[in-house]
A protein has these predicted regions:
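Conserved, structured core segments of small domains
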Residues: 1-106
Length: 106
């Protein structure tokens, strides 16, 4: 199943966010390489970082997202939502059933 991770910036932690950015970026790169993240990036105003994560359960998604250095160090506040993504990248992409089957096989 896909999960949407909303990572909210905390104004009082802005300096910490900047000084820990490389560790956060490396964690994201590692998750992309492992096939756990489909998309990641900030909102245009920088208030949120958002990523779409593949996990077998909500608990697993929360545990993985909690390892993001910005979350683990209390620099950002996270919310993890179950997301039923129907299609990605193209109109003739995998069906909903195929997407769910892919998520179950991970």
């Amino acid at each position: 199943m896909w999960y949407l991770v909303m990572s909210r910036s905390l104004a009082e932690k802005e300096a910490d966010k900047q000084s820990n950015y490389e560790a956060h970026r490396q964690w994201l790169d590692d998750q992309h390489r492992a096939g756990r993240l489909l998309f990641s990036g900030p909102t245009t105003d920088g208030a949120y970082g958002i990523y779409v994560m593949l996990a077998t359960s909500l608990d697993e998604a929360k545990a993985l997202a909690a390892r993001d250095p910005h979350h683990a160090r209390g620099i950002r506040q996270m919310e993890v939502l179950e997301w039923r993504a129907h299609r990605a990248f193209r109109l003739n992409g995998p069906t909903i059933a195929e997407t769910e089957k892919m998520a179950q096989s991970e």
